[in-house]
Amino acid sequence: MAGAAELDRARADLAAAFRWVARLGMNEAVANHFSLAVDDRGRRFLINPGQVHFELIRASDLLLLDADDAAVMQRPDAPDPTAWALHGTIHRRLPHARCAMHVHSVNATALGCLADPVLPPIDQNAAMFWNRVAVDVDYGGLAFEAEAERVCALLADPAKKVLVMGNHGVMVVGDGVADTLNRLIYFERACEVYLRALSTGRPLRILPDAVAEKTAREAEAYPGGGAPLLASIHRILIREGSDYRD
C-alpha cells in the first residue's frame, strides 16, 4: 500500500486528470470514471464517487476501494454501479492496468459507432496506436458485472492499452495517471482527425503498416511520456487557484 505522501500525490494526480478532461469537454454529465491502483497487487484503487461532475472532483473526494470487497456498493458515497463493475474487474483481472480511464468522448465514441471501428494510421497520432487498440463490437448493454467481465477480457493483452467500446465509448489503461491521460488525449485527437478526413468524402492517404509500427515504437520510447503534460496541468490548476488538491 502506498505511504501517506505517495497516496496524497496519487489523489492529486487523479483529481487533476478529472479537472483537465472536463476542461477538454471529454466527460459526459456526471457519468464516466477513472481509477488508479495504489498498492503493489493493484487491488486497492482510487475512483471517483458517483454522480459528481469531473469539474468538482477534489483529491479528498476520491474513494479508496478494495477490488475484492463488493460491500463498498453499500456505502452512502458508493461509486456508480457500472464504475464499480468495470474498474473493480480491471483491478482484479488486469494487474498491468494500474490506471483506467473510461469516457464517452465524442470522437472516440463516434469511431466506435462505425461499421468498421478500426482507426487506420492516417497521421502521426493515429500511427501511435497501430496494433495497440482492442475493439469491442458486441455491445450488450450497461456495463454491470457480466458485461464488465466480457469487456475487460478484451484488455488482457498488455500491448492493447486502448479499448474502443463499440456503441458505447472508450477505455484507456496505463502505468499511471500521466501515461493514461496522455494516451486518452492523443487517442481522442487521432479519432477527431480521422473523422474529419472521412467527412470530406475524399480518398484517405493511409500510412504503410511498417511506417505505422515504426512510429508507434518511437512514440512508446519517447522521453518523458505523459509526465510533462501532467506536470503542466498541475501548474496551470495551481496558478488558477483551483481547489482540486483539497
Region locations from a protein language model:
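Glycine-rich flexible loops
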Residues: M1-D246
